[in-house]
């Protein structure tokens, strides 16, 4: 929005919408969905048939497709269902909503979602090793960990409709296809670089305007989501973002004091979202016992290449 290519209240679907090329819409109320509704999960999308982002093999069967559905095909599938509520009504977390946002970014920018985020958000924030995930262990990035699901013997039908049985974290789910709904590969350090670049605090230059930083936190109704964040506790001015799926969990918190932290795992358990909340409680309890924080560690300082500085050879 800071670039003027979008507005939070821009319509997404319909003749005047950003994604006007997706024309088959069952519920006319969907034409009222805005970028803001997608960001705070009030678009009204139904999950009566489950979360399509994690039912790709079923969507292939239901839609009689020959290949894995594209983002537009998944969005079109969702729009052939009635909304569960009017846009701007009650909030319900929606992965498909964040896939729609990914396509909004692509159409508005003329670039792939990954390329645009890297060039205009991540690299300016100093995050040079964040990428959209790949689906199989042998395709992992050079510094990427191995993921461990809840049960090493757990297998589900491959997302690609082949009928093969795969681990959920490696081919069972289409992780790459999640795009903005949860496909990013990152380290905790890079996550903190990003948070420090959008927190509105002095010290690290923000990549967003003051107005956009404030807008992210603006909540007008109890129970609503902050824009891009899971929760904003106005009384303590604390921002929280969580995430969990087979093979990984994440918890990020930013406090009014300027202290932020990220906790990422390469495993998961059956507790799902409640596990990430337990992580937050554990870290807050540990932090309350810290009397003094080190001041000699700045992750934003350029560290010289030791070998070049000393002239050593490999």
Give, region by region, the residue ranges found by the protein language model.
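Juxtamembrane transmembrane-helix termini
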Residues: 1-4
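Short, surface-exposed loop or secondary-structure junction motifs
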Residues: 24-238, 242-244
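A short, well-structured edge-of-sheet supersecondary motif
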Residues: 8-10, 229, 260-262
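Short, well-ordered beta-strand elements
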Residues: 249-271
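Short, glycine/proline-biased beta-turn/loop segments that scaffold the active-site neighborhood
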Residues: 6-25, 124-125
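Short, gly/Ser/Thr-rich active-site loops of penicillin-recognizing serine hydrolases
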Residues: 235, 270-314
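Flexible, glycine-rich phosphate/dinucleotide-binding loops
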Residues: 21, 139, 269-270
């Amino acid at each position: 929005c800071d670039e003027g290519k979008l507005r939070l209240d821009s319509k997404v679907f319909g003749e005047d919408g950003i994604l006007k090329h997706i024309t088959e819409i069952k519920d006319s109320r969907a034409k009222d969905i805005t970028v803001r509704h997608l960001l705070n999960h009030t678009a009204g999308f139904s999950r009566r048939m489950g979360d399509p982002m994690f039912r790709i093999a079923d969507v292939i069967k239901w839609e009689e497709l020959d290949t894995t559905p594209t983002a537009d095909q998944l969005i079109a599938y969702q729009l052939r269902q009635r909304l569960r509520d009017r846009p701007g009504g009650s909030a319900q977390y929606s992965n498909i909503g964040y896939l729609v946002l990914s396509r909004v970014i692509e159409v508005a920018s003329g670039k792939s979602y990954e390329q645009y985020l890297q060039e205009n958000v991540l690299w300016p924030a100093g995050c040079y090793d964040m990428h959209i995930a790949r689906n199989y262990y042998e395709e992992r990035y050079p510094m990427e960990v191995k993921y461990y699901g809840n049960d090493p013997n757990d297998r589900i039908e491959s997302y690609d409709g082949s009928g093969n049985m795969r681990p959920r974290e490696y081919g069972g789910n289409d992780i790459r296809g999640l795009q903005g709904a949860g496909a990013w590969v990152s380290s905790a350090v890079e996550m903190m670089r990003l948070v420090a670049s959008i927190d509105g605090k002095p010290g690290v230059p923000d990549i967003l305007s003051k107005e956009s930083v404030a807008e992210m936190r603006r909540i007008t109704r109890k129970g609503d989501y902050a824009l891009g964040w899971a929760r904003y506790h106005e009384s303590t001015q604390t921002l929280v973002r969580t995430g969990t799926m087979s093979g990984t969990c994440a918890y990020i918190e930013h406090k009014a004091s300027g202290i932020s932290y990220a906790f990422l795992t390469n495993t998961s358990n059956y507790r799902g979202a409640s596990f990430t909340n337990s992580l937050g409680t554990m870290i807050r309890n540990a932090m309350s016992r810290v009397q003094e924080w080190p001041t000699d560690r700045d992750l934003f300082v350029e560290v010289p290449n030791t070998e070049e500085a000393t002239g050593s050879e490999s």
